[in-house]
Curated annotation (Swiss-Prot):
Sequence positions that bind substrate: 172
Broad class of enzyme this protein falls into: oxidoreductase
Protein's UniProt name: Putative dehydrogenase/reductase SDR family member 4-like 1
InterPro entries per the UniProt record, alphabetical: NAD(P)-bd_dom_sf (IPR036291), Sc_DH/Rdtase_CS (IPR020904), SDR_fam (IPR002347)
Ranges annotated as spanning the membrane: none
PROSITE patterns: ADH_SHORT
Gene Ontology MF, one: carbonyl reductase (NADPH) activity
Organism the protein comes from: Homo sapiens (Human)
GO aspect biological process, one term: retinal metabolic process
SUPFAM superfamilies in alphabetical order: NAD(P)-binding Rossmann-fold domains (SSF51735)
Domain of life: Eukaryota
Note: Three homologous proteins DHRS4, DHRS4L1, and DHRS4L2 are derived from gene duplication of DHRS4, and the gene cluster is arranged in tandem in chromosome 14.
Binding positions for NADP(+) per the UniProt entry: 36-60, 189
Gene3D superfamilies in the cross-refs: NAD(P)-binding Rossmann-like Domain (3.40.50.720)
């Protein structure tokens, strides 16, 4: 049923596919903006897609599996939000091209790119330096570094046609305070801080802003091994100024702000959302 609904929605691409989002009670800072959100069928990515649509954007979600895309689209359309989706494996160039082409076919423009990419092969980053195989280094740096850069490269020409845009992606508190036993992950997330600064400089003349979010310990499937163990959870809370673990929703206002015109003079910034986790001066 969900697949049929998504196919039916995409089949109407020749007509207006911009559904009017309903039930909003606040100003819509992203009205008529078009946003691509990767890895957006669950957890933080899903919450980001939902919030951007609630704030007025027309959102294209993506994930590796069609059934997950269909379910997310059906759920969010059911809330009266303007939502479409397509399959996208961030490690495959053809999938990036299809994601961009889908957005352009449906909406004609791209204003926002939100990259919520996580390495899905969890066993490839829980290692120290001496335990880490070459495959783990390749996988982490490919997904958390190269794939993001190339995805942004694919979108920039379309943003330029629009006169500019906003790019955002996720680093981690581990970029500032490395997690013991997560060497490949720590290094790949630290690399994103450099990517953020570099692209902010390169893309500013094109009126494209680039900013980064660095979440702390947020309750997601990635961190499940920590918060599902009550003893570990309590130990983690001791490192926080705000004595609770984060929820995906804790980042949403900041993401929407960074994508909006309210942040038009912000680029190259990394915002920590970590409950006061000690991370830098």
């Amino acid at each position: 049923m969900h697949k049929a609904r998504l196919r039916g929605h995409c089949a109407r691409a020749g007509k207006s596919v911009r559904l009017a989002s309903s039930g909003m009670t606040r100003r819509d800072p992203l009205t008529n903006k078009v946003a691509l959100v990767t890895a957006s069928t669950d957890w933080i990515g899903f919450a980001v897609a939902q919030r951007l649509a609630q704030d007025g954007a027309h959102v294209v979600v993506s994930r590796r599996k069609q059934q997950n895309v269909d379910q997310a689209v059906a759920t969010l359309q059911g809330e009266g939000l303007s939502m479409t989706g397509t399959v996208c494996h961030v490690g495959k160039m053809k999938d990036w091209e299809r994601l961009v082409a889908t957005a352009m076919k449906l909406h004609g423009v791209i204003d926002i790119l939100s990259l919520s990419i996580t390495n899905s092969k969890r066993g490839l980053f829980w290692f120290t330096l001496l335990q880490t195989a070459e495959e783990a280094w390749d996988r982490n740096l490919d997904i958390n570094g190269k794939a993001l850069a190339l995805m942004i490269k694919a979108v920039v020409p379309e943003m330029e046609k629009r006169g500019g845009g906003s790019v955002g992606f996720l680093a981690s508190v581990a970029a500032f305070r490395p997690l013991p036993g997560f060497s490949p992950y720590n290094v790949s997330k630290t690399a994103l801080l450099g990517l953020n600064k570099t692209l902010a400089i390169e893309l500013a003349p094109r009126n494209i802003r680039v900013n980064c979010l660095a979440p702390g310990l947020i309750k997601t499937s990635f961190s499940r091994m920590l918060w599902m163990d009550k003893e570990k959870e309590e130990s983690m809370k001791e490192t926080l100024r705000i004595r609770r673990l984060g929820e995906p929703e804790d980042s949403l206002g900041i993401v929407s702000f960074l994508c909006s015109e309210d942040a038009s003079y912000l680029t190259g910034e990394t915002v920590m959302v970590g409950g006061g986790t000690p991370s830098r001066l």
